[in-house]
């Protein structure tokens, strides 16, 4: 086959060759920051820019002017309903985090108010959650023993909360939300399910009234600890009372029944919301009247009341554990953000509005920073409480403020009434909330759609269940990264054919009716990048196709011999030096076989780099086309090659 014709190539090809230079590297990295709504505004006046900035920072300013008494009535009802669920759950989650009960209540006061001012979700309910509480109780004790040094443990938790808030704020300001996406939906489903089972097993301590328990979180260690502790307390002289189990199981059945009724009949949405508070009131009254604490029933005892005390002086910012606090804070920040954004977006989709992920990160970060200064630990959006808030008919984030005020009144007026609350009730409240964290239906859906995603789901589940939270997260992230890496080093390289009666060229494997052109091999690289990781694979794959094509058509001589390779680069957004080198080597090997090479629709960054590397000059500018159809037509009309 002779070389390509030298006639002037079409104007459409010039559009590709003369496209503007892509943005510089600095703009690519700093562009998202400059585009951040918190720092830019199209307004010309400084006053208007200031108002726009405040409206972006505090979304409440954009809707408070249209807030009505009718909306407040709905938010008031939602907030009170939310508080009835939040108060007992907050106490239980504080116990799960190995903190005194009041710290769970503190966490339901300040963070919800900050979020109501800065958050963009109307339905999300803020406060302590089970997964983050367990995360802290499994990671922080590895640094400081909560039993031997309770004050230092509590102070380290506040420091972790500060770092979590700082990381979350940085993610929002720098628009780094993609970091949260590394924990995929499938991995999150597995992680939540594994965490729910581990949390449930840990509640056996309170449900059975055990005094000795393991600090490990894996299922095997917890079950072993339950057996040995229970056997030791029953056979030894220690006073073990089955009343803890009786009280806990009785109210657990009541809570699960209330949850079942509320799910079956939406008119009774309020029943599972008030059931935990009702359980606390009834069980406390029963223990008080029967003097159950004198008969072995473990009770909460003293709960400190009053407004959140300052914890600024308790932060450990210059001690030996700052590094560990930052590490745990980063993990907590990502887990908390992932759960909150997933919850917020699911309900925003139901209501038909957009949830700004970066604003959510900023709001979450600011509320946790404020929380760390006011004796709170890491808070986020709770799925169970958000569902209750939604079902109660909330209209805005004011329901969070109503809930916070109600919890504050509880702290001021009613904490002394919690003295006789049995620990088994806290365990039963947490256990009743766990079924919502296990989504078997979604896991089955993941299995049907993507087996690799299901592997990440299983990895996170079994890692959390049988090893630890960190290992479960590490396994999930490793599988997710392996999936990304596998897709990067083994990109799709497809042979294209023309769909009859159209100008469309599609994968012949997917569309068997697609017709290939004799002597012309059209190939598409279905990858975002041609780089060092996959360039060799792409080069060898194309050469293998040329050899296979020639071998299959050896009896047809010139008619079957490949005369031209057309590479469709429409999907290719970037190429590095290794990718360019692979293209040059491919071009040389094709020339040695008498095969010409052409490119179709290289994106602007790709064509810019190919021109700078002189690759376009090497293959000839007339071999760059806008569409596959134009490239094939040029070949057939002898612009590309003389007919055999």
UniProtKB/Swiss-Prot annotation:
GO terms for molecular function: secondary active sulfate transmembrane transporter activity. Keywords: Membrane, Transmembrane, Transmembrane helix, Transport. Residues 511-635 form the STAS domain. Low-affinity H(+)/sulfate cotransporter which may be involved in the internal transport of sulfate between cellular or subcellular compartments within the plant. Belongs to the SLC26A/SulP transporter (TC 2.A.53) family. The lineage of its organism: Eukaryota, Viridiplantae, Streptophyta, Embryophyta, Tracheophyta. It is found in: Membrane. It comes from Stylosanthes hamata. It is a multi-pass membrane protein. The chain crosses the membrane at residues 50-70, 76-96, 99-119, 124-144, 156-176, 179-199, 242-262, 268-288, 328-348, 394-414, 418-438, 455-475, 518-538. This is Low affinity sulfate transporter 3. GO terms for cellular component: membrane. PANTHER family: SULFATE TRANSPORTER. Pfam families: STAS (PF01740), Sulfate_transp (PF00916). Residues 1-20 are annotated as: Disordered. Its main location: membrane. Residues 1-19 have a biased composition (Polar residues).
